[in-house]
Amino acid sequence: MTQEGRIIKIAGPVIIAEGMRGSQMYEMVKVGEDKLIGEIIELEGDTATIQVYEETAGIKPGETVERTGGPLSVELGPGILGSIFDGIQRPLENIKALTGDYIERGVDVPSLPKDKKWTFKPTAREGQMVKGGDIIGEVEETSSITHRIMIPPNVEGKLTMIAPQGEYTVLDDIAEVETESGTEKIQMLQKWPVRKGRPYKKKLDPDVPLVTGQRAQDTFFSVAKGGTAAIPGPFGSGKTVTQQQLAKWADADIIVYVGCGERGNEMTEVLKEFPELEDPKTGNPLMDRTVLIANTSNMPVAAREACVYTGITIAEYFRDMGYDVALMADSTSRWAEAMREISGRLEEMPGEEGYPAYLASRLAQFYERAGRVTTIGSEDKIASVSVVGAVSPPGGDLSEPVTQNTLRICKVFWALDASLADKRHFPSIDWLQSYSLYIDSVQEWWASNVDPEWRKFRDEAMALLQKEAELQEIVQLVGPDALPDRERITLETTRMIREDFLQQNAYHEVDTYCSPSKQFEMLRTIIMFHRNATAALEKGAPAADIISLPVKEDIGRMKYIPEEEFPARIKEIQERIVKECSEV
């Protein structure tokens, strides 16, 4: 069995090599004299088709292809949090120290620091029976997160040795397990192939909302922990800011942010902002619980596929520890475009708009790895991976294949609308096009943790927004003054819902995050105004007087009231609504 093949054909990121008999699908190889990292994606006879994750310019036929014998894998262990990796888990800061501002081809840097010592604290005893997923020790990796050291998924047996508390590197043996096939030495470092999902005991119903602090998402289009959401929208509609808001404020324990084929300056913004931001829950830097994977548009196309899988594998690893993880992929369209390019190089039959026929199944494989699960191990830990994928349809056309296939898989659809963004309505989530299929699942949580009437108020507000859309056609023809008074009150209420509730300023220190109880009280106040105004109208009050009530100014400003002052101030506003409406 030869361990080396020879290049016979090169087409951009795709290379065909002969003499590769005995290799396996998705095996990792090192291509050419520069030892560029690649992955076998097709085997026929003794020829292998390889996609290369680095720039292939300058490689020539006849150069060697060296097999590694294993699939493309990520290294999992202390040192992941707070790091910035490229698509194949090479730490960018270390590469910069080695090669300067530009990544040189074939640069080989260990994913995790091998010489750094971590303080290991054992939590298991010698002699106890352990199996995959059991926690045997802890490492204080950052000020926010304790890294739990687990037995690898495929190991089961008796713990014969565990290291005492002390300083160890990720390669030091910290435990030994006596299995049926011999003694397994356990290190803090684990390797896992990126294309294979990590195992779990069972999937659970997603019935706990992922609270994001964004009113439009939480109240109207909730995503559950372990759920999947898609954010399609044209250029400039606010996809990246929406993703960054979720990364900052979502109540997940760990955030994995994958910049997949987006512009370099957007990733730079994340890299500059996140280290300065404070985690609202702990007061520590937000980077302490974040992993960034940067694979910008000027990096090699093939690595986009790897970066999405790298991100989800890291997310599953932290899920297995018992943490709730949120993964932001920005943007899955760039990954689909990479698939289209490689499919074209392979001369495969194109599907719709040139995308490969397997586009839907690849997207599904990725999103299906999200979920709220009972993790493997002796203890039943409940943890989740929630995935939010941005989609950038060319020209904002939501009927294109990537958006349509994503919609079939995801249960939450936050449609961003360019016309709303042009009106400076942010987040520009179109309340008529968007939907969430988790509303029925999460209403129990809202009822028991916030208010039993949450669903009633939410549905009433949605019905009013639908009614406004119907009335808009008449308004455009004859103007608002020609409408009956009841309809004018409806239009005024929906204007308040749009401007005072749905609009949210990501850069305002108070309005950037809105707690579930504040969201509910704000919505209740607006609906309360509508009900009292309608009652006043029926008693004969003129619509013009109701619309110009002074309390409306306070309703408009309620989103800027700090959380600690909010309960008292909102009560006062609600009392004024009742008083002013009854006195009209």
From Swiss-Prot:
ATP binds at G233, P234, F235, G236, S237, G238, K239, T240. It is found in: Cell membrane. Keywords: ATP synthesis, ATP-binding, Cell membrane, Hydrogen ion transport, Ion transport, Membrane, Nucleotide-binding, Translocase, Transport. It is a peripheral membrane protein. It catalyses: ATP + H2O + 4 H(+)(in) = ADP + phosphate + 5 H(+)(out). GO terms for biological process: proton motive force-driven plasma membrane ATP synthesis. It is an enzyme of class 7 (translocase). Its main location: membrane. GO terms for molecular function: ATP binding; proton-transporting ATP synthase activity, rotational mechanism; proton-transporting ATPase activity, rotational mechanism. It comes from the Archaea. PROSITE patterns: ATPASE_ALPHA_BETA (PS00152). One of its GO terms (cellular component) is plasma membrane. Belongs to the ATPase alpha/beta chains family. Component of the A-type ATP synthase that produces ATP from ADP in the presence of a proton gradient across the membrane. The A chain is the catalytic subunit. This is A-type ATP synthase subunit A. It comes from Methanothermobacter thermautotrophicus (strain ATCC 29096 / DSM 1053 / JCM 10044 / NBRC 100330 / Delta H) (Methanobacterium thermoautotrophicum). The gene is atpA.
